[in-house]
């Protein structure tokens, strides 16, 4: 049996280690494989990265024997400690086979929902993963424009987008993608992609770019938090049933939200919480615990909510 990697938070959530943390993950995060065949400029697992192989984003991952990891996750689900499992699959020659085996093993634990975030290349491969028991599939765009995709990730954004759309049409409401803010796109470019995803029932997990030692982008800065807040607000308003046109621009920047009493509409703070698949909270995935959070993994305090509104800098009507 192979070694799996559990995020440190997951190891705490399933009882494999003791952690002092204000909130444990509600999803069990598993990394399958290491040393990716791709060469994304922001990723610790990239082909040319010199980062330690135990990292993905700023999270450390702990090697665990496969059988032990499956048992701990399954029992934690049965005990109500986690809501689902998420397989973060590194693109390697045997990655598809690893996922198929993992899905087969998780079936031993009944109704445990398993999300697979991987690099399948055809609708038929996606169908096989669903047939094997995946609850949802994630196919990461990461980057908002074809030009940036080619320079940062390599390959064709259009091909990835067309595959994502084809899967969303065949498996409506069961597809997720990740988008990373701060890779050189404008707010308008990111907003356009978010809206196109939402129209197709593709769930968006919004991330803030995180510079990592050993990657090509190690010296780049994280995104402006105000820009990130504005995109979070727009995404939340889509979820609440508002039209995309309520988000207004001057040039490439969001400057106004055309919603009466918009701050009352957003008073629940959900706009600034972690986005993506249901029950995914990703504690401290984008920032250190002492930093102001891009994505809050828990309800915001009144002070945090006030700060997030102020950071956005937008006006309502």
Predicted regions and their residues:
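Conserved strand-turn element in the central/C-terminal portion of the radical SAM core barrel
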Residues: 164-188, 208-209, 214
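Immediate flanking context of iron-sulfur cluster ligation sites
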Residues: 24-35, 248-275
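Flexible glycine/acidic-rich beta-alpha junction loops that bind and position SAM and/or redox cofactors
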Residues: 147-153, 184-185, 203-228, 241-264
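N-terminal [4Fe-4S]-dependent radical SAM core
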Residues: 1-63, 72-75, 271, 283-285
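Catalytic cores of alpha/beta
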Residues: 122-132, 181-200
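Alpha-helix-loop-beta-strand connector modules within alpha/beta enzyme cores
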Residues: 97-114, 156-174, 224-244
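Core AdoMet radical
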Residues: 47-96, 107-125, 134-162, 176, ...
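Radical SAM enzyme core and accessory elements
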Residues: 1-10, 261-317
